[in-house]
Amino acid sequence: MKILMSNDDGVYAPGLLALYEALSTMAEVMVVAPNSEQSGCASALSITTPLYTHQLPSGFIAVNGTPADCIYLALNEIYSDTDFDCVITGINSGANLGQDVLFSGTFGAALTAQLFGIPAIATSLVGGGAKSSEQECERHYQMAASEIVKLLTDTPILDICKNLPYHVLNVNIPDVSNADEINGRKMTVLGHRKIARPVHHVVDPRGRDAYWLSLRKRQDIWADNTDHVSSGTTMTDDQAVAAGYISLSPVRLHHTPAATLDMLSALML
């Protein structure tokens, strides 16, 4: 098996390293990732600036671009002669729940892979070990990585993904250090936050107004998601991780809802 990896936290991120080490026990793994953090850039491509690559002693390839750039470059140039079985991105530092997928570079990289017909899985550690010491944080990522390997080896998820074109599997893993703290896996739908992330206004040393779009949220407030749930037993992704489950959300690239399209067509035409 051949797996291509990337992320949005950068080529030196602990989540990327932990996942690489875990996946390398079961597959040949290649890494092409940004040379610096690219959180929040979604599936943006660099079309006005050139991209440069640098191979690290680890064999990882660093790119001065976005996560989507990395996948685009890997599939069409660097590893264009390689038939990858799948692309796995992450492990992201922090959750990618609900509408996070619209902004996440980790998800955007997986999305780019699917546009080229490669099965893709985006992975995130909810909390990203933020509550832990550096050593404990490393254990959390290692635990999350081992759960991803179990998902690939103990379930037919890769075969399922291969038969679901234009879908990305979005995986969120609770931030714990021991596997026995995880209650299992749940298939979920994306949740929905009721409030936007705050904007912080500051004045820089030259007296100019400056604004920070905060990626570290205040307390999340989640909407009632019952209208998105397909059955009474289906959880949203945020509900699942809050209950100690690994959340698995299939996300379809085809965003046009057929029922809404039919309704509007009947009204407009």
From Swiss-Prot:
Positions binding a divalent metal cation in this chain are: D8, D9, S39, N92
Q: Which GO terms describe its molecular function?
A: 3'-nucleotidase activity; 5'-nucleotidase activity; exopolyphosphatase activity; metal ion binding; nucleotide binding
E.C. code: 3.1.3.5
Catalysed reaction(s) here are: a ribonucleoside 5'-phosphate + H2O = a ribonucleoside + phosphate
Q: Which GO terms describe its cellular component?
A: cytoplasm
List the taxonomic lineage.
Bacteria, Pseudomonadati, Pseudomonadota, Gammaproteobacteria, Moraxellales
Cofactor: binding details = Binds 1 divalent metal cation per subunit.
Question: Which species is the source of this protein?
Answer: Psychrobacter cryohalolentis (strain ATCC BAA-1226 / DSM 17306 / VKM B-2378 / K5)
Question: Has UniProt tagged this entry with the keyword Metal-binding?
Answer: yes
UniProt-recorded name of the protein: 5'-nucleotidase SurE
* A Pfam family per the record: SurE
| InterPro entries referenced in this protein's UniProt entry, alphabetically | SurE, SurE-like_Pase/nucleotidase, SurE-like_sf
As for what it does, the entry says: Nucleotidase that shows phosphatase activity on nucleoside 5'-monophosphates.
Q: Which domain of life is it from?
A: Bacteria
Query: Which keywords accompany this UniProt record?
Result: Cytoplasm, Hydrolase, Metal-binding, Nucleotide-binding
Quote the subcellular location field of this record: Cytoplasm
Keyword hit for Hydrolase: yes
Describe the family membership recorded for this protein in Swiss-Prot or TrEMBL. Answer: Belongs to the SurE nucleotidase family.
In the UniProt record, the gene name given for this protein reads surE
Cofactor(s) listed? a divalent metal cation
